[in-house]
């Protein structure tokens, strides 16, 4: 499978239904492809695939031979994109989600100690900042779980120049700051120092003092702003030119952050009593909002009670992953290993949270589909 076109094949209609007629009595392997091209050959990099674990013994007409397609993880590691950005950082996109990645500058080796590396949340993209850009070329090694994966070379021209514009995003909820969270500023490049003299807080047009700005211990691109904010008050923080000094002596241009501290009464609590039909199995329960963004994730094996506090009023939903291999995340399927993607149960009940209200619910996770 995957090396040549199948000798027997058909296509589905718009609803996914298919038929194969006039087959002789025999034993068959059945696969499904959702192709990007039309070559009828499985291309792991681009196509989705489905399969039946067991062969079909065709000795009479068969109905309801159903397959679900999925996207496999790449079996062979590859860097699918790389570039030297206009700010001098190195960017790489990978075709695999790494588990325990380690990145090193091997040439010039002197650049390795001061490098800064930031992976995205799924470990399939990374950016590297170097504190010296006088090199002609640089080699980067990528390892995962102690295994060498690849070495990538970046080259630059001697006359190349770079522009660094410091930009700060935030965690505001529209015009409001969640009273249960500090104000967080996340920058597009590493910040090396903060000048607290280059800022002021305006509340009713009166400059204020007492603010602290510290680097987040888990994310070097993020700074936490703390101040004794008062609920329902409007604030504006003004940062002057050069308040933040970034890597390679870059400076920010003046910017403001305006918001009102929301009231705690606008948030609620959801308590879930979770009952499992199969003891000893591991589950991952995710709470998602209307946009299907995961706002919380919990892992457990037996009946439990989960409490989600200080949630913004709105509609929420629950989905549960049957975590077969107990690694704390959803895993796709694998044709070679004859493994299906991990099943997901979507709770039909909408779990709305109202302002200043505690909601108690019970959900029962059914047996995993396909188990006896």
Show which residues each predicted segment covers.
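N-terminal targeting or signal-anchor segments and their processing/structural boundaries
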Residues: 1-372
């Amino acid at each position: 499978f995957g090396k040549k076109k199948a000798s027997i094949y058909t296509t589905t209609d718009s609803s996914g239904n298919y038929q194969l007629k006039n087959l002789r009595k025999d034993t068959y392997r059945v696969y499904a492809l959702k192709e990007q091209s039309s070559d009828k050959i499985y291309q792991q990099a681009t196509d989705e695939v489905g399969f039946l674990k067991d062969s079909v013994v065709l000795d009479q007409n068969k109905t309801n031979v159903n397959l679900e397609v999925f996207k496999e993880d790449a079996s062979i590691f590859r860097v699918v994109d790389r570039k030297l950005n206009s700010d001098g950082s190195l960017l790489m996109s990978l075709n695999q989600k790494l588990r325990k990645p380690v990145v090193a500058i091997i040439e010039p080796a002197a650049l390795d100690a001061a490098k800064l590396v930031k992976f995205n949340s799924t470990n399939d993209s990374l950016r590297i900042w170097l504190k010296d850009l006088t090199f002609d070329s640089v080699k980067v090694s990528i390892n995962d779980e102690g295994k060498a994966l690849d070495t990538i070379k970046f080259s630059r021209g001697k006359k190349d120049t770079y522009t660094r514009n410091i930009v700060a995003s935030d965690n505001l909820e529209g015009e409001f700051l969640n009273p249960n969270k500090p104000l967080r500023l996340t920058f597009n490049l590493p910040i090396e120092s903060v000048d607290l003299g280059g800022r002021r807080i305006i509340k009713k047009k009166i400059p204020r003092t007492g603010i602290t700005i510290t680097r987040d211990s888990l994310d070097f691109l993020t700074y936490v702003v703390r101040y004794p904010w008062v609920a329902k008050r409007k604030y504006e923080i003004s940062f002057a030119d050069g308040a933040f000094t970034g890597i390679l002596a870059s400076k920010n241009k003046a910017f403001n952050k305006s918001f009102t501290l929301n009231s705690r009464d606008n948030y609620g609590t959801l308590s879930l009593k979770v009952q499992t039909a199969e003891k000893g199995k591991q589950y991952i329960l995710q709470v998602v909002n209307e946009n299907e963004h995961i706002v919380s994730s919990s892992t457990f094996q037996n009946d439990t009670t989960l409490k989600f506090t200080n949630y913004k009023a709105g509609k929420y939903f629950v989905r549960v992953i049957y975590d077969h291999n107990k690694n704390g995340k959803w895993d796709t399927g694998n044709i070679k290993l004859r493994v299906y993607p991990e099943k997901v149960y979507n709770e039909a009940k909408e779990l709305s949270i109202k302002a200043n209200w505690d909601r108690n619910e019970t959900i029962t996770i059914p047996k995993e589909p396909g188990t006896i």
